[in-house]
């Protein structure tokens, strides 16, 4: 059976892994998942990530905890295969009044809402992380 929304699966694995206090979670790798993982690492939501395997690459994310609590309080899919959500640069949302991030896929790559606003770019809102 094929997976309908691999990004939602990635976010669910992160959410479930942190709920179970796992050190790391693994999932099938793709360019978009690696780009999202890179944004999460730059923003301090995960410790690190690595890609293993050649024929079927596997993405492994090291989850991050602070004083025993998960750093990611909430992670929510916004744009999905059945309903894509696109926003212009002036319409980009501020998650939790700027405390969280929106991961945006732009013409210049995957970045946070703050970086997209600075670059003057809009794009597809992939998810919210707080």
Curated annotation (Swiss-Prot):
Lineage of source species: Bacteria, Pseudomonadati, Pseudomonadota, Gammaproteobacteria, Enterobacterales
Q: What is this protein called?
A: Small ribosomal subunit protein uS8
**Keyword annotations for this protein?**
Ribonucleoprotein, Ribosomal protein, RNA-binding, rRNA-binding
Q: Which SUPFAM superfamilies match?
A: Ribosomal protein S8
Disulfide bridge map: none
Biological function: One of the primary rRNA binding proteins, it binds directly to 16S rRNA central domain where it helps coordinate assembly of the platform of the 30S subunit.
PROSITE patterns the UniProt entry points to: RIBOSOMAL_S8
Outline the subunit composition: Part of the 30S ribosomal subunit. Contacts proteins S5 and S12.
């Amino acid at each position: 059976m094929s997976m309908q929304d691999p990004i939602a699966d990635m976010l669910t694995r992160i959410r479930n892994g942190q709920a179970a206090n796992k050190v790391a979670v693994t999932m099938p790798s793709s360019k978009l998942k690696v780009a999202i993982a890179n944004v999460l690492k730059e923003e301090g939501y995960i410790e690190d990530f690595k890609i293993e395997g050649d024929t079927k690459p596997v993405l492994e994310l090291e989850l991050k905890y602070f004083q025993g609590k998960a750093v990611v309080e909430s992670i929510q899919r916004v744009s999905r295969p059945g309903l894509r959500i696109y926003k212009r640069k002036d319409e980009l949302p501020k998650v939790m009044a700027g405390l969280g991030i929106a991961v945006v896929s732009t013409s210049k790559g995957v970045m946070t809402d703050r970086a997209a606003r600075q670059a003057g770019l809009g794009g597809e809102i992939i998810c919210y992380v707080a």
